[in-house]
């Protein structure tokens, strides 16, 4: 038996669909930002501490801690699947932003893999370096953090504009400013420590704070 809707019921149905789409647009996003935000924060802070505590070149081996980022992949996949199961309406923005973050993830994985491989290849070629210049073996890592922050800035800014969520836009701008700060501080003798500390702070403002605000918005508290 066919059910005919009057004009009022049709408008109410359309309104519910729009609200559903808007709500589902944010559903689960906060957890994803928190996952990667806390993971990057833990790794960057750990590297900063190890660089400060360990003597000489031994501290630079802490950069291999970035391989721990792989821990977040299965959790990320699980969260995405849960979001897709709960999502009633998949908008065009969802599809575009999905592609943006896939491209971002591939870029980060490529960057981390490239740094690790380059380090393994470059290390043997610097068998003898002058005392105090051991950092020359780890030159590729001086570009790693600025590149990461620039990618963060792009992804956060685009996401913030697409979802009309200002904290993400602000986080993206902060990451871009941090990138400039790091690029002009290459001459500093403690540049690697500075990079990890700047990355730690940037992730707090770019991922962790927006992530918690997104969760509040999902629960209707914002």
Label for each model-derived stretch:
Residues 152-222:
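Terminal transmembrane helical module of multi-pass membrane proteins
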Residues 27-121:
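Selected alpha-helical membrane-embedding segments in polytopic membrane proteins
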Residues 1-31:
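N-terminal juxtamembrane cytosolic/stromal segments of multi-pass membrane proteins
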Residues 100, 104-171:
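Membrane-proximal helix-loop-helix units in multi-pass membrane proteins
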Residues 62-70, 135-148, 197-201:
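Structural signature of hydrophobic alpha-helical transmembrane segments
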Residues 20, 76-92, 154-161, 208-215:
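C-terminal ends of transmembrane helices
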Residues 49-60, 117-138, 185-192:
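Helix-coil boundary and interhelical linker segments in multi-pass alpha-helical membrane proteins
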Residues 23-30, 34, 59-62, 94, ...:
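Membrane-water interface of alpha-helical transmembrane segments
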